[in-house]
């Protein structure tokens, strides 16, 4: 359940200046989202902070349930381990996909019962398994014979899901090697689970984080169907299929600054058809689970940051570059900035002259920057240190990946709006 990322260093690029009346230097956000409340909160903020719109998250949850009725949601906690967000999702009926005993404990504090929490991490020590079992969790993901043996010893009688590997094709983060096993190994794993006194409960997949194609879901379904058919011959009848995460956010840009436009309607159609296909294959009725993370929270979180400096420097190759340094970056809110771009808004500069700049965070790490290949951002030339910058669609992983004081920069505080009246939190 830990995402693989690749760091990128920032090569030199030419920049040009031109006049524009655009409010920002990038394409507008999808019209599907009502950003009225979150924009008002950004405007009201007088210091840097992350803002979560609980009402927006609730609308997103309702839309997901409407597209996939009957599917049990297990929110991927790693995407947004903020107590108020978790409490709100629990009240809506969500359970939780936890990756550690610490996440399990946090999930339990929302008031959900342990049967709405599964230990979705295939990587866990004997101690982790025993702790989760003591906390009441009985559903464990697995992908190896060694892990099955450990679960049998430290969580006797537990239910196991075997994670079947996918290629990760079409996703920004593929998750294809560290997690999951081949369909052939899945048969061995579930055979071993049964022999060890565990309940072979289900199969799971993950098509990759920020999946951009519907075909990935279709391929995953075919792989699951093949395993189910083989299990029928072995006399193993499963109860549940966990379709994992991967549903995308809509408000971010690719690393070149182009809007990402995943075919969400087609994805849902393929998933619905896939569930029917798997029901016809399995020897008994199937329940389905889903582990959305960024899909629920990314587009309903934003950061109020400020400008550290807009500077112009000549590089060793003779090119001149403009750099916009922000008060937050990869290590305190924008961890994924090397693989995608967040939409920036400059509320104090609705027009005027713009320059194309590399956007970077405040730390002394050169990875703390947008990957600038053909993806320079239009920035108001007149913007000054201290002026606000609004960063949209960064509600996923903003708090989870933040460091604790790298270079002395502390995690951002957060505010939750909507829900039962909103609340202010401490550092993320």
Model-derived features with residue positions:
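Structural preference for beta-strand elements that scaffold enzyme active sites
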Residues: 72-74, 95, 116-118, 139, ...
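Charged (often Lys/Glu-rich) extended helix/loop segments that serve as interaction or gating elements
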Residues: 270, 276, 280-428
């Amino acid at each position: 359940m830990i995402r693989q990322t690749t760091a990128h260093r920032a090569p030199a690029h030419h920049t040009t200046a031109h006049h524009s009346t655009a409010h920002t230097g990038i394409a507008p956000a999808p019209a599907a989202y009502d950003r009225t409340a979150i924009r008002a909160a950004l405007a009201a903020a007088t210091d840097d902070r992350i803002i979560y719109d609980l009402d927006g998250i609730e609308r997103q949850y309702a839309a997901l349930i409407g597209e996939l009725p009957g599917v049990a949601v297990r929110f991927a906690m790693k995407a947004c381990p903020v107590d108020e967000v978790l409490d709100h999702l629990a009240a809506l009926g969500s359970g939780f996909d936890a990756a550690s005993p610490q996440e399990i404990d946090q999930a339990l504090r929302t008031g959900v019962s342990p049967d709405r929490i599964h230990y979705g991490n295939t990587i866990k020590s004997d101690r982790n398994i025993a702790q989760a079992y003591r906390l009441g969790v009985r559903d464990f993901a697995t992908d190896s014979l060694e892990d099955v043996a450990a679960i049998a010893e430290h969580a006797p009688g537990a239910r196991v899901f075997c994670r079947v590997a996918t290629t990760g094709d079409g996703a920004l983060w593929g998750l294809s090697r560290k997690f999951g096993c081949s369909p052939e190994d899945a048969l061995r794993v579930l055979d071993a689970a049964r022999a060890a006194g565990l309940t072979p409960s289900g199969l799971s997949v993950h098509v990759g984080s920020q999946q951009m194609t519907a075909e990935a879901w279709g391929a995953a379904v075919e792989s699951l169907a093949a395993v189910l058919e083989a299990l029928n011959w072995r006399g193993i009848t499963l109860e549940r299929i966990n379709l994992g995460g991967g549903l995308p956010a809509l408000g971010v840009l690719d690393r070149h600054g182009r809007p990402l436009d995943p075919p969400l309607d087609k994805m849902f159609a393929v998933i619905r058809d896939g569930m029917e296909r798997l029901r016809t294959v399995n020897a008994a009725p199937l329940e389905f689970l889903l582990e959305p993370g960024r899909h629920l929270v990314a587009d309903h979180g934003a950061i109020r940051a400020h400008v550290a400096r807009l500077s112009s420097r000549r590089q060793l190759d003779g090119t001149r570059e403009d750099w916009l340094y922000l008060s937050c970056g990869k290590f305190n809110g924008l961890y994924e900035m090397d693989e995608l771009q967040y939409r920036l808004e400059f509320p104090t500069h609705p027009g005027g002259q713009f320059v194309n700049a590399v956007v970077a965070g405040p730390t002394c790490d050169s990875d703390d920057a947008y990957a600038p290949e053909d993806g320079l951002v239009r920035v108001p030339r007149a913007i000054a240190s201290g002026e606000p910058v609004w960063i949209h669609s960064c509600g996923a992983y903003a708090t989870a990946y933040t460091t604790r004081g790298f270079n002395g920069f502390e995690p951002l505080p957060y505010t939750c709006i909507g829900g039962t009246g909103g609340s202010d939190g401490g550092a993320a």
